[in-house]
Amino acid sequence: MSLWELEDRRSCQGTPRPAQEPTAEEATTAELQMKVDFFRKLGYSSAEIHSVLQKLGIQADTNTVLGELVKHGSAAERERQASPDPCPQLPLVPRGGGTPKAPTVETYPPEEDKEGSDLRPIVIDGSNVAMSHGNKDVFSCRGILLAVNWFLERGHTDITVFVPSWRKEQPRPDVPITDQHILRDLEKKKILVFTPSRRVGGKRVVCYDDRFIVKLAFESDGIVVSNDTYRDLQGERQEWKRFIEERLLMYSFVNDKFMPPDDPLGRHGPSLDNFLRKKPLTSEHKKQPCPYGRKCTYGIKCRFLHPERPSRPQRSVADELRANALLPPSRAASKDKNSRRPSPSSQPGSLPTEHEQCSPDRKKLGAQASPGTPREGLMQTFAPTGRSLPPSGSSGGSFGPSEWFPQTLDSLPYASQDCLDSGIGSLESQMSELWGVRGGGPGEPGPPRGPYAGYCTYGAELPATPAFSAFSRALGAGHFSVPADYAPPPAAFPPREYWSEPYQLPPPTQRLQEPQAPGPGADRGPWGGAGRLAKERASVYTKLCGVFPPHLVEAVMSRFPQLLDPQQLAAEILSYKSQHLSE
């Protein structure tokens, strides 16, 4: 190959030139571009990356730049949410479709605004609060600030404090004021308002600031914060009186802590949260279920919920009778007629009793007594199971051991069941009426107490003992006092360990022969009446004994032998009891 050809080949291939070193500016630009590409892969825009790199510098660490980008991105997101796009893009629709409606942006008020709008306006008696915080010796403006801050922390925005304008004057030894600058600060925030006052002839003329407070709170349907009851203003207007009773929020200061009560209107009123709201959040005062359940012995006085007895009246039987005694006779009679319940003996499907199966005469008696009044049904219900009370005119019959077996509480009439709720005494009186009284000796069954002592049931027979004869004579005479020779032995009923235990049953005794001659009062009822009158009096006596002590019932019914209305008798018993308090 010739030299000329070799030079031509070199000229065609080109001779390599030495590489030139990049400048510092080019290196910086390349590094910047590399970092921008790296952060763009993470989802950040070029503008955000350039602003952060310009702030931190190109030599900043990758973690530092990434942290700043995260902060910058969250701030931009908040700004984007705060100012939504006024012209949102319309959604794409297929060809031929209708014109899409522009989406409406629903603006919801902030949660704090909704919370504040539901709260009542607050009107604070500044003088009362300041003097209370100063222990009634110093006008402590710090107390006003504590009260205002307490309501501001709860979300209240409408707060007004009234203070007389003369409190802006320089304090004097006789009128000490502390932290007076707080009044000016609250006035600048438009929370505190000074009531007008001026000097006339060297004397200070002060407007009545209490009237400002009550008037503004009444017109704005707000809350008055004060320990003053404003008695003078209650007498001016009736609506102000009602408003002050329902909207006055009292308070206490525990050192520097403002403490209003959790129950501003008492333990049965609304809570503090609902008291300060225009609409209560939840329904309150849901009673908790009673922990004792069906074993509860408090009756209607129990403050817990008893779902097993939903139809219980809210008032006791005594309160019902007292209320009925104050009603006119016509309204009381209609109310008593509506409140009566059907007796268990009138329910369908009841088994025939023993006396209906053994004697046709007894069947006739039952047929005659069946269409009677509800009082007769109540009286028959009170009789022992399987027995019926014959009319008072029947002289035959006697008492037997089967008549002394107690009833269950379910078989009691409703009047007796209601009075079990009135306490321990009424329960024991019911038990004593059910089991009766034993007298004469350990083996002799004594006559029962109560209005049924004069009646004889179909069964065994009793001897004419002196105690029984004396008791019969006492019944025939028209009163129920037990004679002196009638003394029940202490061994008749063993003592009970607990009051809730029932009396133990007496031991069964053998049936004795019927006395030859009935007592002089055997053909008459307990009060000397006969037939329907005696039954009605017995029924009324049973009802009243469930409410009042038996001796009071006997005394009043003996004074008014022809009076059978329970409401009138209850009124007479109350009157008699008030006149004989020493008994």
Curated annotation (Swiss-Prot):
Residues 15-29, 341-352, 384-393 have a biased composition (Low complexity). It comes from the Eukaryota. This is Ribonuclease ZC3H12A. A zinc finger (C3H1-type) spans 284-309. Gene3D superfamilies: 3.40.50.11980. It comes from Bos taurus. Keywords: Angiogenesis, Apoptosis, Cytoplasm, Developmental protein, Differentiation, Endonuclease, Endoplasmic reticulum, Hydrolase, Magnesium, Membrane, Metal-binding, Nuclease, Nucleus, Phosphoprotein, Ubl conjugation, Zinc, Zinc-finger. Endoribonuclease involved in various biological functions such as cellular inflammatory response and immune homeostasis, glial differentiation of neuroprogenitor cells, cell death of cardiomyocytes, adipogenesis and angiogenesis. Functions as an endoribonuclease involved in mRNA decay. Modulates the inflammatory response by promoting the degradation of a set of translationally active cytokine-induced inflammation-related mRNAs, such as IL6 and IL12B, during the early phase of inflammation. Coiled coil: none annotated. Residues 1-29, 73-119, 262-290, 323-404, 503-530 are annotated as: Disordered. Residues 65-134 are annotated as: Necessary for interaction with TANK. It is a peripheral membrane protein. Signal peptide: none annotated. GO terms for biological process: 3'-UTR-mediated mRNA destabilization; angiogenesis; apoptotic process; cell differentiation; cellular response to chemokine; cellular response to glucose starvation; cellular response to ionomycin; cellular response to lipopolysaccharide. Phosphorylated by IRAK1; phosphorylation is necessary for subsequent phosphorylation by the I-kappa-B-kinase (IKK) complex. Phosphorylated by I-kappa-B-kinase (IKK) subunits IKBKB/IKKB and CHUK/IKKA at Ser-422 and Ser-426; these phosphorylations promote ubiquitin proteasome-mediated degradation of ZC3H12A and hence facilitates rapid and robust production of IL-6 mRNA in response to toll-like receptor (TLR) or IL-1 receptor stimuli. Residues 285-441 are annotated as: Necessary for interaction with ZC3H12D. It is an enzyme of class 3 (hydrolase). GO terms for molecular function: chromatin binding; cysteine-type deubiquitinase activity; DNA binding; miRNA binding; mRNA 3'-UTR AU-rich region binding; mRNA 3'-UTR binding; mRNA binding; nuclease activity. Belongs to the ZC3H12 family. Its cofactor is Mg(2+). PROSITE patterns: ZF_C3H1 (PS50103). Mg(2+) is required for RNase activity. The modification Phosphoserine is found at residues 83, 422, 426. It is found in: Nucleus; Cytoplasm; Cytoplasm, P-body; Rough endoplasmic reticulum membrane.
